[in-house]
Amino acid sequence: MFMINVLTLIIPILLAVAFLTLVERKVLGYMQFRKGPNVVGPYGLLQPIADAIKLFIKEPLRPATSSISMFILAPILALTLALTMWIPLPMPYPLINMNLGVLFMLAMSSLAVYSILWSGWASNSKYALIGALRAVAQTISYEVTLAIILLSVLLMNGSFTLSTLIITQEQVWLIFPAWPLAMMWFISTLAETNRAPFDLTEGESELVSGFNVEYAAGPFALFFMAEYANIIMMNIFTTTLFLGAFHNPYMPELYTINFTIKSLLLSITFLWIRASYPRFRYDQLMHLLWKNFLPLTLALCMWHVSLPILLSSIPPQT
């Protein structure tokens, strides 16, 4: 029975990932005054399926000097961790209702660094290794601010359980009292998922393609799917934290529709940013975090700690 539950979570995620690639190409196309994919199927709707078939029937090449076990294990680990992070997300009911759901998600996103590092190292290519080291430095750095922002939100929430956020936001979305946190959170999620304008790991002009430069066919597709699954997951997480949808237990589908629309709009914002902004320089990327975001988030965290004490009130209890 549990396997059926897992499959009912994984299959829609994989479908969402497939169609997000199509949405991305369409949105970028229209933003650049062109059509995007429109040949395979009506309005190009079958394009992701054609892409998947093409990628998975190609021969998976690997460099002769690569470390085989790690080279194959890295993309599998990347996708597994990307799918595992969906377990505690309330939509409106999570697969497993964890007491420390937020902590679980932080731990899983930290583990995802290993797949990037292994892929870069096992490829035995200078470009891949430099791309991997950049990605690891970027991911680890931005996780610091993500953790502090999460702590501030959880102080308002009063619980580490993600489902409690639905109750906390019945009266007002947390984006209103905590808009500076929400802005920094959104920018940090862009950096965490290695998206433009923070896609330094894929600097085509200098690194060819980044840590996945030696990958082809199936393993490359797994990395690609992991990246897009993480993008959707981060947007869903943002919706849960700052744009909580109203949940009526008698009509849970209303929550799901509300929640899906918000997540889709956030995903399109990701694509809009990609179409609009040029890439950061690497030192600017690190400067933004360590010199700007970190002091601000620490100050706001202290503010959120002191406010309930100042007003001698307590956060909502569960």
Swiss-Prot record:
Alphabetized Pfam families for the sequence: NADHdh
EC number: 7.1.1.2
A GO MF label: NADH dehydrogenase (ubiquinone) activity
Catalytic activity: a ubiquinone + NADH + 5 H(+)(in) = a ubiquinol + NAD(+) + 4 H(+)(out)
GO BP annotation list: mitochondrial electron transport, NADH to ubiquinone; mitochondrial respiratory chain complex I assembly
Cellular compartment(s): Mitochondrion inner membrane
Job description of the protein: Core subunit of the mitochondrial membrane respiratory chain NADH dehydrogenase (Complex I) that is believed to belong to the minimal assembly required for catalysis. Complex I functions in the transfer of electrons from NADH to the respiratory chain. The immediate electron acceptor for the enzyme is believed to be ubiquinone.
The name this protein goes by in its record: NADH-ubiquinone oxidoreductase chain 1
UniProt lineage: Eukaryota, Metazoa, Chordata, Craniata, Vertebrata
Gene designation: MT-ND1
